[in-house]
C-alpha cells in the first residue's frame, strides 16, 4: 500500500521536491526559485528553466529527505508532474523520476499539475490545515500565469471545467502590464506591491465578459487597454501615477474573477469554494474573495502561499492518492504541454 511518496515538480521555472503522505500531511517541501535568472529577460526563458532544473533537482531531493528526517526506505513511490507545462522543464523532472524509479525499485506516476492545484487545499502541516468541514464537492478557481479556469470538483479525478479564459491568463496579463510599466519580473508580485499605495478607482479599465451569462473570461482587451493607457500618459506621468495605475488594473482583474466565482457558486449551489494557483497569492484578490465569502456565507479556502505557487507537495498528494488505488505510469510516459482530454470533463 502506498502511504508516502517523493514528489517532483518542474513544470515551469520553480524546482520543487516534497515528501507527502496520502493523508495530505507534508513532511517536507523545498524549492529553488529562478526569478533572478529570468528577471533580466522580463519573462521565463524555457531553455534556462530546464537547465536550472537539472542543476537544482538532485540537491533538493537530498534536502527534502534530510528535512523530513527520512530516507528512501520511508517512501513507497514517486510522483512527478508530466503535464501541462514547458516541455524542456517537464523532461528534466520526468527523466529524474524514471531514473530513480528504476534505481530504487519504486513505482512512479505522472501527475497533472492543474489537478495538484485543485486538491492543494487538502494539504496540511504544522502551520496549516483545511477547515474541519471542508470536503467535496466544491467550486475552484485556478489562476496562474498560464491558466485561468473555473472547475467543479466532486472527488479525486472527478473534475468538470465550467469556464476558462478565452485568451490570456490572468497571471500573464499581470506580467505583461508589469513589463510594459517597467516593473520587471515577476510581474504579478510587483503590481500587487505597487497597488497597495494606489487608488483602484483612479483609472477606468475594461472588464470583459463580466456580465456574460457563462463562466468564461477574457483578459486580452484589458492587456491592450493597459498598453494604450501607458502610451497615452507617457513615461513621466506613468511613473508619477504608477500606484494608481497598478491598483486600477489589478481591480479590473479581481472584479472579473470574483464575479465569475460568484456566478459558479450560485449556479451549482456550492457553499465551499477555493482559490488556488500562483495568482491566488495576490493580496487584493484574497481580501476581496474573503469579503465576498463572508457576505454570502460561503466557506472559502485559500491555501497558504507555499501551496498556492507551484510546489511539489500538491503533486505528491495527488500522486499518493492515485497510487494508493493502484495507478502507476509506464516508463514510456512522456511530457505534454497540455492537459490530457481525459483529465477533465
From Swiss-Prot:
Binding residues annotated for substrate, in chain numbering: 142-146, 175, 188, 192, 282
Catalytic function, reaction form: L-threonylcarbamoyladenylate + adenosine(37) in tRNA = N(6)-L-threonylcarbamoyladenosine(37) in tRNA + AMP + H(+)
Binding residues annotated for Fe cation, in chain numbering: 113, 117, 310
Cofactor dependence: Fe(2+)
GO biological process: tRNA threonylcarbamoyladenosine modification
EC class of the enzyme, as a word: transferase
Cell location: Cytoplasm
Cofactor mode of binding and number, as noted: Binds 1 Fe(2+) ion per subunit.
Keywords on record: Acyltransferase, Cytoplasm, Iron, Metal-binding, Transferase, tRNA processing
Family under the similarity heading: Belongs to the KAE1 / TsaD family.
Protein name, per record: tRNA N6-adenosine threonylcarbamoyltransferase
Species the sequence originates in: Bdellovibrio bacteriovorus (strain ATCC 15356 / DSM 50701 / NCIMB 9529 / HD100)
Gene designation per UniProt: tsaD
